[in-house]
Amino acid sequence: DKPHLYSAAIESLSENISDSITGPLFYYLLFDLYGAIVYRVVNTYDALFGYRTKRYEWFGKFCARFDDLLNIIPSRLTALVIILFNPKRGLEYITRYGGIKINSTYPMSAFSGVLGVGFEKIGYYKFHGKLPDKDDVFRALKLYKKVVIILLSVVILLCMVV
């Protein structure tokens, strides 16, 4: 159904800010280009091998846990930037839903709160509120752009200072 499809699209968009923007930039600032590359390799390996299959059981677990470890700070930084656009509701949703999964639900709950919509992955989690519609997807894209601009601006400023 469309509301769950829209929910999944916005959830993916919010989580990928951390995975594709904040994480690499964070590790670039700490360890230069090598940090960003290692982060992206680990994140990609988690996506490829992090699921439980007999063939990749141990390697997949290692990738998934290492990715969890590397994302502890970037996921929370991402959520903090997102809630700049509606601090009260964003913080309320992070407090309520942020800890459901170790990292991904922080930016997801921040997006959910700022946009004032609920998310649901049937059988896994449900964030309070009406499920998103098509207009909410466009609002999410606008929020995404604003968050990315802030993240890039901060990194550029830090690079100029250091």
Task: Please describe what each predicted stretch is.
Residues A47:
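Glycine-rich phosphate/dinucleotide-binding loop and adjoining beta-alpha-beta core of small-molecule
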Residues D1-I37, V42, G50-V162:
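Hydrophobic alpha-helical transmembrane segments
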